[in-house]
Amino acid sequence: MIEAKQTGAQAPAAASPERPAVVARAFGALPDQSASLALLRTIADETCTPGPFAPRQPLALYGAGNLGRLARDHLRAVGEDFDLVVDRNAEALAAGGGWAGTRLVHPDAVDTEMKRRAMLAVSIVTSPYAPLEAALSAAGWRDIVPFYDIAESFRDRHPLSNGWFAEPFSDNDVAAIGAVLSAWDDDLSRAHHLQFIAWRRLRQEWSFDGAPVTIDDRFFIPQILDVMRPNERFLDAGAHHGSVTARFIAETDGQFASILAIEPDEQSRAVLEQTRGGFPSDQRSRITVSDALLDSERRTVRFHHGLGYASQISPTGTSERATQTLDALGAAPSFVKLHLEGGELGALKGGIATLRKYRPIIVATVYHDADGIQATPAWLMDNLDGYRFLFRLHSWCGTGAVVYAIPEERQ
């Protein structure tokens, strides 16, 4: 079994008087099949049961980037106040106008009393959490928690689910997860899958030498770029404002056959249409925008709209929508991207005929619910013959997890 590296570091300081800091474990090598199964058993044998944290006042956010803006909007949506936002670029952000009405403060300008009294919700997932938590603790902050762990306490009224916690694993769970670990095409996938599981089950931050978390290549890792061809037919499900569509066009240098960009949220789709309108006419004519709400079958569901990235099928939604299957779209994709806030497995099931007929490259996010640990990758592995499967992390705190399915004939 691979052992965690001995760093000589002292035990981390508590994130608050009530809870310990996040434990970081660094491993010196990538895990092969045997080592990954042993490490999975280590996770399964842990008895801790971490859970969400209700916010308390005064509340501060740390980080004013994309996640910081999402955190701000989420807290406002659930009626939770916050006092300030701490960011090293506070002055420039304040001048930009995107944070009008919000108190933005440089970390060095926060007074000692605020650090002692406030709960600090970290809204950054583009760097490791544990060393940031340790640095904030050393700077005098007394109560530090990942923002997503706070968001999880509002699931009864807001569907944002990126802070979910995995339940303890039974022996059957361990066997099923182990089968997926063994089936990945490379040891890097096993390392990232274990890192994902350790955060979700234990709130431990694992890392492996040779397994960097890459922020900038989500959906377009080298193994995907190596097999992309001219004239791909791209299906972008969960297109949001069109950033992935734009990235696809850039990666193909505009040499694609068609793009079907699917976005069920009206507000996001309006921005998507603007994005489409900004492309040259010869590219714009090959892009179709759809409002389809993908699922495993046609049915009527509640849809929570107006939440930007987090809009999704949810009991908290106030509108009723008819879902549609990928098969019913009549598309013939050669490349399918799914980012559906937990709806990925349902969309895959509703597209089985299309996937088997056209054998596209598939890239799907799997970090929005517990299906990502085993059910979604296992479904792909069980239902698509002649594919190789990879797992990659593109951010920290158990987020940014993507499964990649590449047809063997693309080699």
Where are these regions (language model features)?
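Phosphate/nucleotide-binding beta-alpha loop and adjacent structural elements of enzyme active sites
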Residues: 2-62, 68-82, 88-411
